[in-house]
Amino acid sequence: MPGTERANRVATVLQWILNIGLMALAAILVIFLAKETFTLAGVLFDANQNASTYMLVEGIVIYFLYFEFIALIVKYFQSGYHFPLRYFIYIGITAIIRLIIVDHESPNDTLIYSFAILVLVIALYLANTDRLKRE
């Protein structure tokens, strides 16, 4: 079956391209993670205490976002070249928490963001049930 062989070769080439792209993305994320580490250290020793605390909390949440994306890429390679849904939900929850920390001027927006977190937590619970769990 020459058509099947050709399709397998195309799939293999595309998988290699995807893997190389993800490794490049992981390297970039590690660089940003190191940069964020230095930024957090600078904010930690800043003399302006009020702005420093706010920036430190925001920086820590950004740090966790980088960390979660790197963990997602690692999990992709460990789990047979697929992205587990749970990790995307974790990233979504962390991103919305960061948004609440950064933009908390409107109570209505904060309530909507909190509802979105609740929906994601319910989705995470459903994704971790035995019927949907892959790992």
Curated annotation (Swiss-Prot):
What GO biological process term is on the record, naming one? cellular response to phosphate starvation
Q: Which of UniProt's keywords are assigned here?
A: Cell inner membrane, Cell membrane, Membrane, Transmembrane, Transmembrane helix
How the protein sits in the membrane? Answer: Multi-pass membrane protein
Q: Which residues form the signal peptide?
A: none
Q: Name one GO cellular component term.
A: plasma membrane
Its annotated compartments are: Cell inner membrane
List all membrane-crossing ranges. 13-33, 54-74, 82-102, 107-127
Q: Taxonomically, which superkingdom?
A: Bacteria
Q: Please name the HAMAP family in this protein's record.
A: PsiE (MF_01048)
Q: Which PANTHER family match?
A: PROTEIN PSIE
In its UniProt entry, what is this protein called? Answer: Protein PsiE homolog
The source organism is: Edwardsiella ictaluri (strain 93-146)
Its ancestry begins with:
Bacteria, Pseudomonadati, Pseudomonadota, Gammaproteobacteria, Enterobacterales
Gene that specifies this protein: psiE
